[in-house]
A protein has these predicted regions:
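Short juxta-domain linker segments that transition from a proline/glycine-rich
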Residues: 1-237
Length: 237
């Protein structure tokens, strides 16, 4: 039988609350895949230890945020933007951009990419989605993940991603998945029935919608038209 000190060390090692070791029987813990969206290359139930820990921390923090809102009498902000693949990625991206309230003028005024990351993160949180960052998970496993629990869904971004631009893209990509889940277009990894090929269609949709949300095609074309390309000496056209 372990001593109190040894039990404390066990709790620290397994990243579990100290009181769990004094329960009459082990608690029933639902599979992590019952909360997060399907991820390419990640099989539900056989996640890496690093990723499992990151997910548990995300879920604990989300639950704490919900409890604090309830105990303090605050209204839990609700993300209500449902997306449907039949609408097309361009329309979904434009709708998300409207909900977040980010304008081209604001983007042009941001000092650098790190300010852009902070502004996008703040906009997503104000829309009713928690945003966390998790360390120690290799980028090859995942750059981002979303927890499809409502109200107050959550997005996790891999802090190993050194580029703020890449973090922004991952953030909006996960937001698209949350919107698709609200629209009943996808569900948690444990219950997602589609084949790998079918799922890649969902991923491509999310990629295109996220790109449109960050930089609308119309705005990009307008910016490109304003660029004057100098003729080189070899240009005889």
């Amino acid at each position: 039988k372990p001593t109190v000190r040894q039990t404390q060390e066990l709790a620290k090692y397994y990243h579990r609350p100290f009181g769990v070791f004094f329960l009459p029987q082990p608690p029933l813990i639902p599979p992590l895949a019952a909360d997060y969206r399907r991820l390419p290359g990640v099989r539900p139930g056989v996640e890496s230890p690093e990723f499992r820990l990151a997910l548990r921390v995300m879920l604990q923090r989300r639950e704490l945020a919900v409890q604090l809102h309830e105990e303090l009498g605050f209204t839990i902000p609700e993300f209500r933007t449902a997306a449907h693949m039949s609408g097309g990625p361009t329309q979904v991206g434009q709708r998300l951009r409207e909900v977040l309230g980010v304008t081209i003028e604001q983007q042009m005024g941001w000092r650098d990419e790190w300010q852009a990351w902070r502004e996008w993160r703040s906009a997503v949180e104000q829309a009713g989605v928690l945003v966390f960052q998790f360390p120690k998970v290799p980028l090859e496993q995942t750059r981002g993940v979303s927890v499809l629990d409502f109200p107050l869904p959550a997005v996790g971004i891999n802090s190993k991603e050194s580029s703020p631009g890449a973090r922004i893209y991952s953030l909006l990509h996960e937001l698209v998945h949350i919107a698709l889940a609200l629209g009943k277009e996808e569900t948690v990894a444990l219950r997602e029935p589609r084949s790998d090929t079918q799922w890649m269609e969902v991923e491509r949709f999310a990629e295109e919608a996220a790109s449109e949300a960050i930089i609308p095609q119309s705005a990009l074309e307008q910016q490109l038209r304003g660029i004057t390309v100098a003729r080189d000496g070899w240009d005889v056209g």
